[in-house]
Amino acid sequence: MSQILEIKHLSKSFGKHEVLKDIDFTVNKGDVISIIGASGSGKSTLLRCVNLLETPTAGEIWYNSKNVADKRVKPHEYRSHVGMVFQSFNLFNNMSVLKNCMVGQMKVLKRSKEEAKQNALYYLEKVGMLPYINAKPRQISGGQKQRVAIARALAMNPEVLLFDEPTSALDPEMVGEVLEVMRQLAREGMTMLVVTHEMAFARDVSNRVVYMSDGVICEQGSPADVFGNPQKQETKDFLARFRNA
């Protein structure tokens, strides 16, 4: 498999508080990597650093043999290849569903209005949101908003998609519709890094699971290894809390 991303010795501090400590891992084309761990373990900060929404304090992020953590790299160009779906959707409330999925294509990728529209319609249909293209975000449910956010990210035709707890802000009955879209993307070979508390998704859909604790990668491996035969006591304790919840 061809390598897309390589994270080398990545650290991130906010003031004196070190949130990420010497993180190393690689992402290959077609990987679905679930990042699990307790709140405050650094999972979301890791994704934000990978997407350059946060500037790493130290370390390197190699994307297709280029260190994008280098200050000379333009973040918006890199982000068109590595998309992100946020917990809180981050849709533009004053724009329709369709326009939300067009604006990035036109501004960043310089696509024509018609090309952006056709591409947006394709991905909105893919996530089941074609009937709502003229709605504003306030007129649709949380699950529908997240499906629009996924379509918006896909419309940029990224090589990698980052998901930051995409279901944690949703009512329980809406979680399934978002996870099903993500499962379909995995089946189609989309490369994904997913910060999640959805353990069934991590176990059933991922090909690799990364367990983080206190800013470090404590354990990683196949879902069968991490869930079925964890090596570290911290991992065992974390998974036991979920099983007993």
Residue positions per predicted region:
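ABC family nucleotide-binding domain
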Residues: Q3-P223
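C-terminal boundary and immediately downstream tail of ABC-type ATPase nucleotide-binding domains
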Residues: S213, Q220, A224-A245
